[in-house]
Amino acid sequence: MEKLEMLYEGKAKKIYATDKADEVIVYYKDDATAFNGEKKGQIEDKGIMNNAITSVLFEILEKAGVKTHFIEKLNDREQLCKKVEIVPLEVIVRNVAAGSMAKRLGLEEGFKLKTTVFELSYKDDSLGDPLINDYHAVGIGATTFEELKVIYDMTAKINDTLKAVFKEQNINLIDFKVEFGRCADGTIVLADEISPDTCRFWDATTGEKLDKDRFRRDLGNVKDAYVEILKRISK
């Protein structure tokens, strides 16, 4: 397997072509951003830790019956993945009110929601990834109602699986976002990453934040939080 030209560079990753048309190499960077790119910085070894965390979690999800783009971890910063067409939507899963949802709805951060809430955002940095509903998503041609049902069903399975995994490690999964891709045959798979960049993790005993909020909110010990998540899920 040969690494070829870079196809795309995002805020946290680079995507490279390979000598196989249906496979790509994903490289994890140390760059950190928040507030739709308004705050920028670097977290030492973040790419190494997010690659490791995502690899572990995607393998767990595959075993639980969730199809993903992940094939294998290649080295500290790279993984081999199926080449997919990204659905231009983010599904945000909220088990507990925090962050923008708490602010938007006037809820105290940490409020336990009566049901898990799914939110949908349109992936467009220039627009600030606006929240939309299912009808917007279908109306603008981003997806279909049939595809959305598959995505929501997969998201529910991902949430149930990850909550159980992190509960065993004394961590509450507060919220997270996921992205999906279409394989060449139209199959929907989980794509992107699952890491402290894309999730809120709170220690179940102390309430300590173990995620990118430490960077967003200048709480300090950012790298330590990523290290702690990797340590707990690697037991």
UniProtKB/Swiss-Prot annotation:
<keyword id="KW-0067">ATP-binding</keyword>
<dbReference type="InterPro" id="IPR050089">
    <property type="entry name" value="SAICAR_synthetase"/>
</dbReference>
<dbReference type="InterPro" id="IPR033934">
    <property type="entry name" value="SAICAR_synt_PurC"/>
</dbReference>
<dbReference type="InterPro" id="IPR028923">
    <property type="entry name" value="SAICAR_synt/ADE2_N"/>
</dbReference>
<dbReference type="InterPro" id="IPR001636">
    <property type="entry name" value="SAICAR_synth"/>
</dbReference>
<protein>
    <recommendedName>
        <fullName>Phosphoribosylaminoimidazole-succinocarboxamide synthase</fullName>
        <ecNumber>6.3.2.6</ecNumber>
    </recommendedName>
</protein>
<keyword id="KW-0547">Nucleotide-binding</keyword>
<keyword id="KW-0658">Purine biosynthesis</keyword>
<comment type="similarity">
    <text>Belongs to the SAICAR synthetase family.</text>
</comment>
<dbReference type="GO" id="GO:0006189">
    <property type="term" value="P:'de novo' IMP biosynthetic process"/>
</dbReference>
<dbReference type="Pfam" id="PF01259">
    <property type="entry name" value="SAICAR_synt"/>
</dbReference>
<dbReference type="GO" id="GO:0005524">
    <property type="term" value="F:ATP binding"/>
</dbReference>
<keyword id="KW-0436">Ligase</keyword>
<dbReference type="InterPro" id="IPR018236">
    <property type="entry name" value="SAICAR_synthetase_CS"/>
</dbReference>
<dbReference type="GO" id="GO:0004639">
    <property type="term" value="F:phosphoribosylaminoimidazolesuccinocarboxamide synthase activity"/>
</dbReference>
<dbReference type="GO" id="GO:0009236">
    <property type="term" value="P:cobalamin biosynthetic process"/>
</dbReference>
<comment type="pathway">
    <text>Purine metabolism; IMP biosynthesis via de novo pathway; 5-amino-1-(5-phospho-D-ribosyl)imidazole-4-carboxamide from 5-amino-1-(5-phospho-D-ribosyl)imidazole-4-carboxylate: step 1/2.</text>
</comment>
